[in-house]
Amino acid sequence: IGGETAEHPGLMPVDEYDVAGFAVGVVDRKDLITGENIKPGDTLIGIASSGVHSNGFSLVRSVFTITEESLNTYYDSLGKTLGEALLAPTKIYVKTMKSIKNAGVRVKGCSHITGGGFYENIPRMLPDGVRAVVKKDSYEVPPIFKMLQTDGEIEEDMMYNTFNMGIGLVLAVA
């Protein structure tokens, strides 16, 4: 089991604590998704995220001045307040994965797009010698990421290396 300890520089006083939770699942060995059978020519399917999820907030805080007023400011481009866009709950993909399995789709690999964005997470599911080609123009990047990129003058590569850019889960299928 892997994991990390979240750091909140400049956000939390030394004497405060961050409370987090986790879940552990059980799967039959025959249903394990290992990525070992991914081959060139397989298809990658991106499943939408619900927003920023919980990654890249140090960069978010460097782009936006976070105050009660700024978080409560409504933006037409977002269709909501900045706070609502940034704090949208992280999507959990259990129901999505169950539906895909029940539809008979053979998932060969699965990559949760977290810290490290596309560039670090997608390769983790690929066997040696296999690489992914992501067609960035095949979906619409959500407005919160466009706003972050524009307001922060952030290069596209940095955006895809930090954020999920609207794709929270990538599946490799035959």
PLM ranges: what are they?
Residues 1-58:
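Glycine-rich anion-binding loops of enzyme active sites
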Residues 12-19, 70-71, 76-87, 91-174:
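Glycine-/charge-enriched secondary-structure boundary and capping motifs
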Residues 25-27, 42-44, 48-53, 61-64, ...:
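Glycine-rich beta-alpha junction loops
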Residues 38-84:
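Acidic, glycine-rich loop-and-beta core segments that form the ion-binding/anion-interacting portion
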